[in-house]
């Protein structure tokens, strides 16, 4: 039986052997692995890019105080970004499942059309959900736009839901029962040992104790600072500005979880973040162009 961490190790090794640069998680709160600059920003411009990484993802509204067996406000994704998207991307994915001990000839694996959109990033793509014996475990996306800019060449994204894959492989129905690791003395460290307390306390904060007034001020401050950086002409500050956009995005998600934003206000906030994302995307492409798109081998 593969432990949670062994699944990660195997995916890292598999994609490294396929030519991907295995990088580390982004050190900020994001709602999905897509928001890591290694996918979102690298999808822009003509430079090739092949990377794989684990990304902790936060969705405050999905917290359930640690009581729900398969719904979390903090979880893990394994992200693969392939640009340009190879013609055999689905075959590569199926090979990665074989590496985990999942034989496509034995199991019911279906690709279900499901196009993707992230309104706050001004991003969308054509894609599929991958269902393994009736459970969604992966999302495929061919990026079409980020920040309103066309992606040329198209980046192919594969996003594995690590918890769901692990629950299937280990045959458990409660995420907290997953075996994360085995210790040298033979003891088992479970997912619950690692994260149950975090789910309880973060859910309590997200829904009951977060300060809506303070969060609103934070959102406005992040937005103002991002605009200030984007207005600088004598230096490229696309990456610091993008981090401020992500901070604004997470703050918005906390406000949403707290119930502090009305339906009408929600659309307005999303529009404000999207406007920043578009400006960042433009600045990022300009900065790479000034560098001569260095990843394009002459």
From Swiss-Prot:
It is an enzyme of class 6 (ligase). It is found in: Cytoplasm. Its EC number is 6.1.1.14. It holds the Pfam family tRNA-synt_2e. GO terms for molecular function: ATP binding; glycine-tRNA ligase activity. One of its GO terms (cellular component) is cytosol. It catalyses: tRNA(Gly) + glycine + ATP = glycyl-tRNA(Gly) + AMP + diphosphate. InterPro entries: aa-tRNA-synth_II/BPL/LPL, Gly-tRNA-synth_heterodimer, Gly-tRNA_ligase_asu. GO terms for biological process: glycyl-tRNA aminoacylation. Keywords: Aminoacyl-tRNA synthetase, ATP-binding, Cytoplasm, Ligase, Nucleotide-binding, Protein biosynthesis. Belongs to the class-II aminoacyl-tRNA synthetase family. Tetramer of two alpha and two beta subunits. This is Glycine--tRNA ligase alpha subunit. It comes from Neisseria meningitidis serogroup C / serotype 2a (strain ATCC 700532 / DSM 15464 / FAM18).
